[in-house]
Amino acid sequence: MWSLLLLAALVGQGFALKNVFDMRIQLPHSVNFGETSVSGYTEFPPLSLQEAEQLVPESSCNMDNHQSLSTINKLTKVIWRKKANQESANQNSFEVVESEVSFKGLCMLKHRMVEESYRNRRSVICYDLACNSTFCKPTVYMIVPIHACNMMKSCLIGLGPYRIQVVYERTYCTTGILTEGKCFVPDKAVVSALKRGMYAIASIETICFFIHQKGNTYKIVTAITSAMGSKCNNTDTKVQGYYICIIGGNSAPVYAPAGEDFRAMEVFSGIITSPHGEDHDLPGEEIATYQISGQIEAKIPHTVSSKNLKLTAFAGIPSYSSTSILAASEDGRFIFSPGLFPNLNQSVCDNNALPLIWRGLIDLTGYYEAVHPCNVFCVLSGPGASCEAFSEGGIFNITSPMCLVSKQNRFRAAEQQISFVCQRVDMDIIVYCNGQKKTILTKTLVIGQCIYTITSLFSLLPGVAHSIAIELCVPGFHGWATAALLITFCFGWVLIPACTLAILLVLKFFANILHTSNQENRFKAILRKIKEEFEKTKGSMVCEICKYECETLKELKAHNLSCVQGECPYCFTHCEPTETAIQAHYKVCQATHRFREDLKKTVTPQNIGPGCYRTLNLFRYKSRCYILTMWTLLLIIESILWAASAAEIPLVPLWTDNAHGVGSVPMHTDLELDFSLPSSSKYTYKRHLTNPVNDQQSVSLHIEIESQGIGAAVHHLGHWYDARLNLKTSFHCYGACTKYQYPWHTAKCHFEKDYEYENSWACNPPDCPGVGTGCTACGLYLDQLKPVGTAFKIISVRYSRKVCVQFGEEHLCKTIDMNDCFVTRHAKICIIGTVSKFSQGDTLLFLGPMEGGGIIFKHWCTSTCHFGDPGDVMGPKDKPFICPEFPGQFRKKCNFATTPVCEYDGNIISGYKKVLATIDSFQSFNTSNIHFTDERIEWRDPDGMLRDHINIVISKDIDFENLAENPCKVGLQAANIEGAWGSGVGFTLTCKVSLTECPTFLTSIKACDMAICYGAESVTLSRGQNTVKITGKGGHSGSSFKCCHGKECSSTGLQASAPHLDKVNGISELENEKVYDDGAPECGITCWFKKSGEWVMGIINGNWVVLIVLCVLLLFSLILLSILCPVRKHKKS
């Protein structure tokens, strides 16, 4: 029994989980003016017709539901059934039954209900039903004031057995509607629709509810008659009211019809032309079968005497709403017609109805919200980095190849904030945000962590510890050189003798080994000579008894005496006088080396004479003179090494730290430069061209080449749509195929294949006795249309760069294209060729804001498009909707006593879904600084994927006598500095530069300290005051950065901040991509000493307490030296 209860509980939980659905309501992250409401809907699986009539919506949200929806609403229920007498079955063998039914919470909104709910902070929750004769599919709609997003994140709605989790999702739009990944703001002015070239057009989903209200201003049938051009009588006595609509799930109420609002005009047109709207098919119901019984008329309400509504009876999956309102009565006769399609065709005046709820796409004019750039910050967090991205107008797309970017976003005020974690900081962090490539230099994060660690260890003196830490934590050799320099200065008087002693011990150890080895080799040589001499004069030195080879004569005599007597000649132990016994004894005897040692004592001196070992023993490593000499020498060497290593290694070889000045080129021959330049890079070349005959005559040359601009003349193809393909079989037993109008006939894209008068007993359902009388209609149509992107076809593409040349006082500029040249009297600059991935005829597809880049299609259909091709469903801007062709073949599948079913062997997957499945096979491109119209797109490539082949030739024929004098005078002043020295991010120096004596002057301004320049900016100066910002990387704590032009610098400099733990800002790649070459000399020995002196002066002028602490440590080391190594006292003789 308990097992059964447990099983029931588990099954009940599983059933409950299946009945929980999501309703996601998208809303902008700012509340705009007006009575803006947001809406959403959710469709559910079918219920029985009896259960559907008992539904009541419930809500657990903290906003009250509007009370009027809890009232009971009465409708006329119309159902159809077969006639009782089936003896002579024909096309009229069925009948309708009218009755009154009551619903609670049905979407029968009252006048001013939505407006009142906005003012009272209440929600409107209702439902609609799509039914056949046996079951219904409910759809729940919810309208809430936009303030709900500030009051709740989610809530729960109940409808019968179903539960709806309402989730409010903030988009990155400020106030607009999210469509195609862009934020669209509709414009209601009619003039914007007339001047479409000035505005964008977007397809927006709209939900409309009919409001019944009597009054002269609400004669909706009169408006329909006027729009359709039909001549209907007695329109004053027909239904009165209006539609209230929410556009894109986020808008103020739109009232239709309204002649002064273009949005209302488009909505009203959509309701008239496609009154059924979008179908209610659930996933898996794309392929379905209808059996049409025929047309019939009914009485609305059931108490009237004459029939006033035409309907079409069917059996099959319900796809469209079963609620409507009778058009012929001004009293508001609401209809519930399960299993019947009401006649919604407004081209006829009688026996028709209006939809109670309408949902569909409409084309609206308006504009897209601007895309704002991103700010990305990172801080070190554990083994990785914690980063945040901000954007004023929201973030539409953020990705990173090395970070974990969550899609759960949160907002802060008017900006959108996204936090994410990067697991590795051993390489720079790259983030793509709102179409911009940001690089966070993690070197600075590591510097900050190092500073924090050292400061924490010496927390008693935090100021001093921080000043020392910022010197020690510079990455690379420079940091180690700094550590060595500080240690030598503070503890050198103790470490020098200690290290010297350790070195002497090691050297003496090796000297002793070498001395012993030399003695042993010398002794072996003596033995060898003695043995050879003995063998020459007296014979063998082998004992005759034991056969042992002796080394000396004394040893041989001992063998001759002892071996005969059976004794060991070495230890005098008794043993048998046989060779085997004595040889075995020798192996264990401990005195076999006795005669060898005696001889060694005789021939080897016992004391070690003067040599390396004795010299090492006599070395006076404790001498104060030696320690002072080494201390001073080490400080000088380490200072030079420290200064030489103070330059930062750049990310890419775009800037190389060098000394002041500009390089010179003697013009013996023409000066030619030939190189390849990435599309994202700028190029600056500056030299002094000198007269080969007279070095005193020179002309300044400055060439600046801007980054590549890409301009494409395009044809705006329109919006590309994703869609769902439906295959519906409609069978009716009697009549021609043209007898009935099916709901899919009002879809934008549909195709029908008819099999007329082909039914027989082998292809009929049991209730159809006719033979050769009916029709099987196979309908293909597209629904759930959703715009996904914008397509442009390239007519021509142009790659260009702006080139400026300053030759002496001559200043010229020109924008040149591929295979074009800029020719002056002395210079010729050409773009010989461009390596590109764009070509004429390509199609550019933007799946979102154009700032985010796009995809290149080499094959995009424009004329004959099949469903499933790229570009299959298109909505051109100023042309009718373009539908694809369906090239597959239809087949009618028949079985005995079974309703025929249509089969289609063509493709059923949309082109957009196919592209998404294989998107990695297409070429993509990123864009920056994009500007676009319907006819032209201009942008820059931030990734440097394209390259230009550039050739520069400077003629040697220069009139140096007339061009050597340059009248332009430049004045410099350092105004402000931001950033940090020595860090990966660098600093930005703001310079005030004045120009006199000439109107314009192209030159470069550098950011330098006393010795080295760390960055430059090529700029065209105008007469008067100019502001120039220079970005540089490197320097040290003593660097005073000045604005320099050539060898002249501003009188005062500014010091940058130290690297610290503040957030590291991302660098835009376009701002950082520049190649600068002015031929300035590299830093030499004099430059190194300048850097060292500037550093020392910086410490003295800055935190002088550091110097005092270092001197105290030096004094401590001297005292420690006197204790450990006291001065030797010499006694007077």
Curated annotation (Swiss-Prot):
Keywords: Disulfide bond, Fusion of virus membrane with host endosomal membrane, Fusion of virus membrane with host membrane, Glycoprotein, Host endoplasmic reticulum, Host Golgi apparatus, Host membrane, Host mitochondrion, Host-virus interaction, Inhibition of host innate immune response by virus, Inhibition of host RLR pathway by virus, Inhibition of host TRAFs by virus, Membrane, Metal-binding, Phosphoprotein, Repeat, Signal, Transmembrane, Transmembrane helix, Viral attachment to host cell, Viral immunoevasion, Viral penetration into host cytoplasm, Virion, Virus entry into host cell, Zinc, Zinc-finger. The keyword Phosphoprotein applies. InterPro entries: Envelope_glycoprot_Hantavirus, Gc_C_bunya, Gn-B_hanta, Hanta_Gc_N, Hanta_Gn-H, ITAM_motif_hantavir-typ. The chain crosses the membrane at residues 485-504, 627-647, 1106-1125. Disulfide bonds join C61-C155, C107-C126, C131-C136, C173-C183, C208-C245, C232-C349, C374-C433, C378-C387, C403-C422, C450-C473, C733-C768, C737-C775, C749-C883, C763-C894, C778-C902, C804-C813, C821-C830, C861-C865, C968-C998, C991-C1043, C1008-C1013, C1044-C1049, C1083-C1087. A zinc finger (CCHC-type) spans 543-563, 568-589. GO terms for biological process: fusion of virus membrane with host endosome membrane; signal transduction; symbiont entry into host cell; symbiont-mediated suppression of host innate immune response; symbiont-mediated suppression of host TRAF-mediated signal transduction; virion attachment to host cell. One of its GO terms (cellular component) is host cell mitochondrion. Residues 1-16 form the signal peptide. Residues 755-775 are annotated as: Fusion loop. Residues 505-626, 1126-1133 are cytoplasmic. It comes from the Viruses. Residues 514-531, 586-603, 590-601, 609-623, 1120-1133 are annotated as: Binding to the ribonucleoprotein. The keyword Metal-binding applies. Belongs to the hantavirus envelope glycoprotein family. This is Envelopment polyprotein. It comes from Seoul virus (strain SR-11) (Sapporo rat virus). The gene is GP.
